[in-house]
Each structure stands twice: as structure tokens, then as C-alpha cells.
Amino acid sequence: MINALSCIATEKVAHYINDGIYRNLKYKLDSKSSDQVYSKLLKISRGLIHEYNHEIGQRLELRNVDYGKFKIDRNTVMVLKKHCLESLGIGDLDYIGYYYRDLIDDNTIDIFELLKAILNNETRRNLHYLDIKGSHAFSKKWTKNIGTILPVLRSLIICGRHLQSDDFQQLCESIPNLTYLDISETNVPNISGISSLKNLESLIMRSVELECFEQFVDLFNLTGLRILDVSRSMYKHDTKIINQYVQSNKVLKELRFLECSGTDINKNLLEQILNSHDNLQQVAAINCHIRSLSLHHEVFLLNTATLTSSLKSLTHYLGVHRISSVERVLENMLHLFPKYDPDLDNRFDFSECVKIIINSALKIESSLGIQGYGTLCLWHIARNQDARFQPFDLYQLVCKLLDGVYNNGRLFIATKDFNISLWRTIESLLKLLESSLKPMSYERVCRIAGLCISRNEVDDEMKTRAIPIFATYIKRISSQSVYYIDFNHKLMPKIILHLKKSIELRKTYWITFCLDILTQITQNSADACEKLAECEEMNVLLECFGNLTKASDHLKILKILKNVLLELTDKNVKHVAIDARISVLQERLDEWDDERAYYVFTVLALIISNFPTIVNREPANSLIRECFPEISNVIKIPVSDSKIYVKNGILKKILKDSREDGSLLWALLVIKSSMEQDKSFVNLLTTEMSNLNTNSEIIMNMKAEIKNLI
């Protein structure tokens, strides 16, 4: 619980800094919280945080910073210089490289000078972790000099860097106290000189081309080495590194973990290694020809032979943040789910698998492979009859699959058939969730479904499937959540257009869904109402009214119009896209029941009152006058509505300012009907009533009736 609250708090602070509204100058965050805030700020701003240098300098106390794939610039250098760092991931050098080009070879970056610019004296004395992976070429002799400014460095990552002939040996001599070294995907021709690293415990050399024993013989001088990674991102049929390792007849006595995925390892070679390495505890062999070990070995084998072993492998790689390996395991799991047999793999935990896959997607958001493969895996799990879930896990599964639908344009699974199947799966899961009878928060379900509806890239069939989900669950979330779901006001126009299409196709249930959504949004978002009033979809809504036949549908549209127009009271609306020619209302005049008549009159009165200079009010005014004698004695206006009109100010505004009979008649009718149900109602508008002067006979008669009630 404490960790969850801490995450929420740090994320809020990051958003406040990003929005420029964090002003708590009296309190300086501790280093742990500062690191978390800075990390979240990087994600929110996509690395472009130089605008917030002052806030960062004033309020944060950074110790551990990792820019990952984000680009650093000179402003970043200035910020980092002010902090005492203990670990640093330097990020992409595209921006900063121009200012630190080597004087002799301007195609290279002088990393030594860049590090001196970033690291103040205190940082140099304390920095124990440095990640400078990337593809930019560094200037000559950087490996020889780096140790002079980083005396206590223990961990170094230089993945992907181009190293010249003697660079590696100089590096080992320059920083002899390293305990962790990652030289993956570098062009190291051999590891001669690694003997200088007497304290090295972890050596990561994925996809390093070492083809003969002489190129890595110095490896066996590392008597304290506990972790060795010689894996390959892609299998090559001619790779022989494990065979050469075994043929050397040498042993790393302290070795605990061997990562050899994608290599030439087989069961025979692995047996020989296990027989000679007494302390070996774990071997990773993904995409290798090994399914299991002999029973007498107690070593744990990481592979993807079964779903159970795959899940353990996934947990391991996620823990060490090995992105490519997480992708590889998820991809392999895709081929295992259709073949799942509970009799052969009865220890597999579907619920735990869902948690780990979702956690993978959350922790490594930048990987499209993890997002795509993860969604496919979850889809397979959701369709499996043997899977059993707790309600919260079920909810998380639904949300993640909805993410998959929304992101289908970015992922590599965006086929129409798959997306339809995915929607059907989501609908089935939601029914299961309903039957669990557990209270759940459906904000995220509504938010993602709403994004699917409003997003142009999502095809019509996908939107059609999102609408009933949105309509069902928008009724179960708070009014504030409804407001934020349509904060960009793109959803309602899309729903209105879909309503029009549903009417044309006579899809009764889609009409109901669309009207329910519009009702909920217009009741809870004043901004959305204002935006809708100004767009052409308002006229489409009136057109829909004219094309509908059911009284209940008429009533829903009238309520939506009332919600929109009521929110515009006292708003300075410069344009309203509503057709004041009320032919669509007049055509069905004879069919009106009392409730529809009330809402029609309310809509007309609000048009007259709110837009005196924008629309032609006379048709609306005439219709109210014409029909008023017939309906004034039968309409019953809800007192709850009347109180809204008082609180909103529309009654006061009409009684004080209006010179149109139509709106005045409506206001007096509201007062009369409400007084008949609640005598105290008139006290709310005594002054306005007494100041109302008019020569209109029909209005004078209404005033007299109200006085008689008093």
C-alpha cells in the first residue's frame, strides 16, 4: 500500500512540474522520491525537460538518473552538473554530440569531455554506475582516460559502441575495480586484458563475435566471475562459442548463472558444463535444443519448452530488464498457448501469467514487441477454458486487451479479423466481470472505449463494438470521470454521426446506446456542451429527432438538447450551430404527450433566452404562444428541474431581461407548476416576479394565476 501511494504521489508531482503548477518551495524532495519524479517526468515530457530546469534544481535531489532512449542536450548537462549522482544512464547523444565533437575527428564524440561537463567533483567521487550504450563513435583514447575521473566506478555498460584495436585492454586497465561490465553487440575482436578486472563478478557479452578459444582465453582468469552472458539475439548455425568453452577444459569455479540463449548449446554440452561447474545454479537456454535436464542435476533451466518454464523465464528477464529476451519469450509463448494441455503442464498459473505479462507491458512501455506479443498472449489466455481469474485480475485483463484494440495502428497485429475476435473476447470477459458481483472502477474501460470511438484510425466496425461497452459502463462512473473522458470534446460529434447512421439503418439498439452516451456526457460536462453547441452536429441531432418515431427516443434527444442549452446560460457564445427553424418539432406537434411538450417548450425557451442576437427567435416564440393555452394546465414540471433552473440562474435571467413572450411564458409555467407542488418555491423569485412588467394579456393572466396560488 505504501509503495502504491508513493507511486501515485511521485506521478502527481511529476505532472505538476510538467504543467508548471508545482509551487511547494518549502519542501525539498528526498533523493529516492526525486529520482522517481525525474524518471516519470522524462516519460511525460518524452525527455524534453529543459523547460523545467529551475523546478528540478529547486525541488529535487537527484542521485540516480537514466535517460534511456531520450536525447540529452546542453540544458540537461547544466541540470545534472548541480546534483551529486551515484548512477547515470547518459541516453541518446544526437543533440549534444555536435557540441562535443572531437577536435581532430569531428565524426566522433569526445565522451571524456562530455562526462567532465556533466559530472561535478562530488559526482566523480561517488559515481559507481555508468551506462553509455549507443552507436555513436567515441574519440580515440577515451578508454584510457575515463578511469582518471571515475575512481569508484563499479558498473559500466558500453553496448553497441565501436571499439578500436586496443580500446578494450586500455578500458580494463583504466577501471580495474569494475564488478559489472556489459560489452554486448560491440566489435571487440578479443577480450585480452580482461584479467585486469580482478573484482569482476558479471560479464555480459551478448552477440560478441568470438570465434576461437584464443580470443577469450583470458576469461578464465576471472576467478570471482559469477554471471556470464554469451547469448545471441539471433541464432547463427555456425556459432561455436559453447563448444569452444567446453573444449577448453577450463572452469570458472564461482560461476552461478550462465546465459547462453541462441547459441550452439545442446544437452550434451550442457551436461559437460554442469559436471565441471559445481556452483552453477541457473542456465538460460532460450531458442536452443534443450527441453529439460537430467534429474540428478539441481540446476534451474530457463527455457520456453513449456508454458510453466516460459513464465519463469519471463519473470527472470523482466527482473533484469532484458527487453529483447522478454520479447523473445513472449513470442515463443504464442506458439505454446494453442497447444496447451493441462494434463502435461498442470502447474501453469494463468492468473499469475496475466499479472506478469501486464507488468511487462507497464515496465517496458517503449517496446512495441512486448506490447504486441503481450496482447496476443493475453488474448490466448482469455479464450482458454481452463483459465480462472480473480475479479481484479479479470479487470486488468480487460483493460489491457482494450489497450490492444486502441493501439492496433501501432502494433503489428492490426488485422480486422483479429480485432473483431479481440472485441468478442473483451465482451465475454466483461460479462464474467459483471457476474463476479465485485465493485469495480470502470473509468479505464470507458476511457479506452471512448478513445476507440473518437479515433479516426479505428475502423467503423471497431467503433460499433466499442459503443455498447462505453454506453454500459459510463453509467457506473463518477461525473468527474465522465468529464475527463471527453476532455478533448471529440467524442460527442462522433456519437451523433453514428446515431444518424444507426437511424438510417434502423438499428434500434445502437440508437439507444448512442442516446444514452450523449445523455451522460451532456449531464456532466459543461465544456463538452459548449463545444457541441458550436459544431454542426447540433443540427444533425435535430435532424435525428425528425427521423425517429419512438416517443422515448424523442424524449432522450430533447433532454440532451436541454442539457446542452442549459449549460450555455450566461456563457458568451459567439456562434451556435442550431437551426432555430423548428419545423422538426412542429411536424410531430399532435403526437406530443405532456412530458415531451414540457421538454420542447424548455428547449425553445432556452434558445430564445440564450441566443438573442444569434438566431431567429420568432418561430420558437410563436410556437410557444400558439400551443400554450392547450398545455399550460396539464404539464407537470419536476420540482428538481425547477430548482436547477433557479440555481442555474436561467429563470432569474428570463424574468429580468427577456422581452419575448415565449421564454416568459415558459418561466411562469415553471413557477406555477412548481408552486402547485411546493408552496415555498415562489419565495426564491419574489423580487423578479414583482418587477415583471408586460402588456401581454397571456402573461398577465399567468401572473394572476400565480398570485392566486400565493
Swiss-Prot record:
The keyword Membrane applies. This is Gastrulation-defective protein 3. The chain crosses the membrane at residues 597-615. It comes from Caenorhabditis elegans. GO terms for cellular component: Cul2-RING ubiquitin ligase complex; membrane. Keywords: Membrane, Transmembrane, Transmembrane helix. Its main location: membrane. It is a single-pass membrane protein. It is found in: Membrane.
